[in-house]
Swiss-Prot record:
Gene Ontology cellular component annotations, sorted alphabetically: cytosol
Keyword check for Transferase: no
Protein name as it appears in the record: Molybdenum cofactor biosynthesis protein B
Family, per entry: Belongs to the MoaB/Mog family.
InterPro entries: MoaB, MoaB/Mog-like_dom_sf, MoaB/Mog_dom, MoCF_biosynth_CS
Gene: moaB
Keywords, ordered alphabetically: Molybdenum cofactor biosynthesis
GO BP annotations listed: Mo-molybdopterin cofactor biosynthetic process
Pathway: Cofactor biosynthesis; molybdopterin biosynthesis
Length: 168
């Protein structure tokens, strides 16, 4: 698989960032802002229209994700709502939409979180990734540490390859 890591796409990758939180707004949303900055640093387009915040409510999350699935977007990244608290419903909203789950993402994310970031608290994460038709969805925790780990170690290194595989 190593030969696929440097896949170049002949177009700009387009992403959407959805922060799920009952308390964050556009000023205090460090996780969503971090996702956006890390993607844009790699020339991934995240327009203002494709960055928003919704409450920890299953219908709100599902509605926004479904809306973006109908648009010209390659990848949707949700932050927040992936834990085990009663209000954490991102996974329940996103997982039923997936055509295929990318199990390795959640497994590797939890492993790296354990080793490099939060230790045994990694078991609380229910981070998930998958595909819906020819689009990718990643649901990750909202902390900036988790965002950086997911984006820098897993998502960004494989993003072009994943999109290439989905669209060939």
């Amino acid at each position: 698989m190593g030969e696929h890591q440097n896949v170049k796409l002949n177009r700009t990758v387009k992403a959407a960032v959805l922060t799920v939180s009952d308390t964050r707004d556009f000023v205090t949303d460090k996780g969503g802002q971090c996702v956006r900055q890390l993607l844009q640093a790699d020339d991934v387009e995240v327009s203002d229209a494709h960055y928003t915040i919704v409450k920890d409510e299953k219908v709100a999350i599902t509605t926004q994700v479904k809306k973006w699935l109908e648009e010209d977007i390659d990848v949707i990244i949700t932050t927040g709502g992936t834990g085990i608290a009663q209000r954490d419903v991102t996974i329940e909203a996103v997982k039923p939409l997936l055509t295929k789950e990318i199990e390795g993402f959640g497994e590797l994310f939890r492993y790296l979180s354990y080793v490099e970031d939060v230790g045994t608290r990694a078991l609380l994460s229910r981070a998930v990734a998958g595909t819906v038709n020819n689009k990718l969805i990643f649901s990750i925790p909202g902390s900036t540490g988790a965002v950086k780990l997911a984006l820098e170690k897993l998502i960004k290194p494989e993003l072009n390859h994943l999109i290439h595989e989905l669209t060939k």
